[in-house]
């Protein structure tokens, strides 16, 4: 796995999932999101426990395909796994990894906002909604809800902010300390923060829950949290 050094040099553009990021993404995400491996294992297990033969599962912003590959390996059923991403560089790595593991996954280059979804049992979105502009975020969640079958599940992870400014700063400081322990320098941390400005737009935990409820989900609950990183499960059922 190539080590992430993307922000070791002065940035010249806003953050994007280009070839440079894709080449180090697996290392970047593992060192940038606390308990990422454990969190993805939790998401995988939620999915595996809620699918049956031929169920359709979408991963929105699938990046290099690691989660869908893990689901394919762990599920006792043959599933229709569809990974969508806007980055060709990410998808090339996803195709290569899936082939190496001998699993069948339909990776597609797509705009998840305009994509025509088929009925599905599961939707996954790991740290993807936060990159969708706020005006388009709720309409996307509505599309997800509409495409889910009854009792279908939307599992999504998001970086969140606190409504309390003091706590929010403290959580950010704790997070930056975490990144330093992962080997990132103060310069790299500052560079990435600047590159993500107005690209990653987080909501509070409450705003995320209110959004999915407004779209029709009868149940939503956080199932994992570390400081300002949260994973939610929302279920399509009558309130």
From Swiss-Prot:
One Gene Ontology term from the biological process aspect of the record: tRNA wobble uridine modification
Reactions the enzyme catalyzes: prephenate + S-adenosyl-L-methionine = carboxy-S-adenosyl-L-methionine + 3-phenylpyruvate + H2O
Catalytic activity, EC: 2.1.3.-
Keyword S-adenosyl-L-methionine: yes
NCBIfam families in alphabetical order: carboxy-S-adenosyl-L-methionine synthase CmoA (TIGR00740)
Subunit structure: Homodimer.
UniProt-recorded name of the protein: Carboxy-S-adenosyl-L-methionine synthase
Gene name in the database record: cmoA
